[in-house]
Amino acid sequence: MRAEIHEDVCRNGFDAELNCFVQAYGSKELDASLLLIASIGFLPANDPRVRATFEAVERNLLVDGLVQRYRTAGSEDGLPPGEGAFLACSFWLVDAYCLIGRVQEAEELFDRLLALRNDVGLLAEEYDPRQKRMLGNFPQAFSHISLVNTAHNLSRKEKPSEQRGR
C-alpha cells in the first residue's frame, strides 16, 4: 500500500508543466509543506523533482526572504489575503537548504529567524516582514518545535532524510 501511495503522489502530485510538486492533485498552487518532501524521506534531496520544487517554493512563496504557507490569493480557504510568513515554514526552508548543500544560506536564514524572537526568546505563528511584527498565535509551539528541530539538523553531520528508514 505504501508503494502504491508513493507512486500515486509522484504521478499525480507532480505537475510537469510547472516542473514541481503542487498543493493538491490537479492544482497549480504550491504549499510550503512541499519543503518537507526530502526531510521526511519521501524522495531524496538530490531528486531533480525535489530540487525543482524547492526552487518553485522560493520563487512563489518567499516574501522578503520568509516563507508564506501558500498564496492566499489563489486559494479557497476562506481567509482574507495577506497573511504573514509562517515561521515554521521558514525553518523548513532552512532544512531544505541544508539537504541540498546550501549550508551558508541555511545558516543565514536560521540566524535571521532567531533574530525575530522577542526579548524573552518567543516566536509567534507568523511574521510580517514588511511591518516587522509578529502575527497570529503567540507564543506558537509549532514555531518553537521547528526552531529546535532545525537547530538540531544544522548541528548534525547526517541531515534529516539520511536518518529515515533506519
Question: What do the PLM-derived regions correspond to, one by one?
Answer:
Residues 3-86, 108-159, 163-166:
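Extended glycan-interaction surfaces of carbohydrate-active proteins
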